[in-house]
Swiss-Prot record:
One or more lysine residues are methylated. GO terms for biological process: translation. Forms part of the ribosomal stalk which helps the ribosome interact with GTP-bound translation factors. Belongs to the universal ribosomal protein uL11 family. Keywords: Methylation, Ribonucleoprotein, Ribosomal protein, RNA-binding, rRNA-binding. HAMAP family: Ribosomal_uL11. Part of the ribosomal stalk of the 50S ribosomal subunit. Interacts with L10 and the large rRNA to form the base of the stalk. L10 forms an elongated spine to which L12 dimers bind in a sequential fashion forming a multimeric L10(L12)X complex. The keyword Chloroplast does not apply. This is Large ribosomal subunit protein uL11. One of its GO terms (molecular function) is structural constituent of ribosome. PROSITE patterns: RIBOSOMAL_L11 (PS00359). Pfam families: Ribosomal_L11, Ribosomal_L11_N.
Amino acid sequence: MPAKKKVAAVVKVAPQAGQATPAPPVGMALGPHGVNIMEFCKAYNAQTEGQRGNIVPVEITIYEDRTFSFVLKTPPAAELIKKAAGIKKGTENPATHKVGKISKDQVREIAETKMPDLNANDIEAAMKIVAGTARSMGVEVEV
């Protein structure tokens, strides 16, 4: 069995799917660690090509020999909610000003998408998490 590589750093960035470039935020996050930024951008863009239009967070593990590996996460719940509600951004005052509406089916769909990254045991708990995020953005959730 080969020896394990020593981890030098773990970096999290959230570029647009299929559109990562060496410019900030990717370049600023990886540059100080001496990683080949273009190599990462090409690999990331190839893996996220089918999800264009979404923000796809990625956790990059950088090793001492300047190699890297990365794990793709699911898009942020807020982004999925904005897309489902058809709004550009949430409200500053969710208690009084509602900016959109999503159905229970849309909440379930978002919860199923986010399930691998949420610390919920079942889909119902995941739906509660997503509904809470929606309410905090000023998006009404239909029961």
